[in-house]
Amino acid sequence: MDSPSTTANGWIDEHHQGVRYGLQGRVLVDETSPYQRITVIDSSRYGKGLLLDGCWMTAEHQERHYHESLVHPALCSAAQLERVLVIGGGDGGTARECLRYQDVKHLDMVEIDRRVVELSQKHLPSLGSHAWSDPRLQLNLENGIAWVANATESSYDVILIDGSDPAGPAEGLFNQTFFEHCRRILRPGGVFATQSESPEAFRQVHIDTVRLIRQVFGYADPLYGWVPMYPSGWWSWTFAAIDGPRYRNPLPARAAAISAGCEIWSPRWQQGAFEAIPAFIERELT
């Protein structure tokens, strides 16, 4: 859909076939960039939030469900953390969580839409927080698909895909060519991770994504959690590596250093989230 619908009593809804998901609040910004429609809202339940092309992306008071689930299984398990790549993530939340690790020396964020960054910095400053001023962060306002295709082989220790649903500017983040380029630029001992949709609301997209990543990398597993404002609330992130499923085993020293500052992630939570694969998904993947 191109834009969220707003009802007379202040409900702002994301629509899909036969269902809708909404928050009550007011629209602060509704504009169209060269790439997508961007809406910023102030909700009574979750604070200020961001929608792209009418789909919920994030909100102040529940964003950690998403960002901690994407970042910490990868950064707690990769062999090295010197160079990190984030594709998308213009709200700043993924970069913020990555830069909590002192071993990260350089983080490339590649975000195609300048307005997503600018509006997030203005209206949702807590998401990016200190990351925007951290000298380790390099913001590249470029096409992430082209960036990955042109990057040097074995140039990143961790690659995180923080894109929207597979439509519009994010459509190319879900195909085999893109995943093959990610594998090519991942260093030995590295970890790749991407959001991989809802196993309930977008079941076939989720299954196809996990299957394709597993085919390309050799080792890949979905992790399941919840993002309250997303369709069905049930979400997934898929982690991959070339040299074995290292993403399942957080390194104790890193986990101890990072877990105290987390609201959702912990080694125990992560173990359960990987094991929480539904039977119907497991059957499809074996």
UniProtKB/Swiss-Prot annotation:
Subunit structure: Homodimer or homotetramer.
Principal EC category: transferase
Family of this protein: Belongs to the spermidine/spermine synthase family.
Subcellular location as annotated: Cytoplasm
Amino acids binding S-methyl-5'-thioadenosine: Q36, E111, N143, G144, P169
Gene name, Swiss-Prot/TrEMBL: speE
Domain called PABS: residue spans: 9-242
Binding site for spermidine: H67, D91
Highest classification ranks of the organism: Bacteria, Bacillati, Cyanobacteriota, Cyanophyceae, Synechococcales
EC id: 2.5.1.16
Coiled coil residues, start to end: none
Keywords for the protein's UniProt record, in alphabetical order: Cytoplasm, Polyamine biosynthesis, Spermidine biosynthesis, Transferase
Gene Ontology MF, one: spermidine synthase activity
PANTHER family: SPERMIDINE SYNTHASE, SPERMIDINE/SPERMINE SYNTHASE
Name of the protein in question: Polyamine aminopropyltransferase
GO cellular component: cytoplasm
Main localization, broad class: cytoplasm
UniProt pathway: Amine and polyamine biosynthesis; spermidine biosynthesis; spermidine from putrescine: step 1/1
HAMAP family named in the record: Spermidine_synth
Known function: Catalyzes the irreversible transfer of a propylamine group from the amino donor S-adenosylmethioninamine (decarboxy-AdoMet) to putrescine (1,4-diaminobutane) to yield spermidine.
Active-site residues from the entry: D162 (proton acceptor)
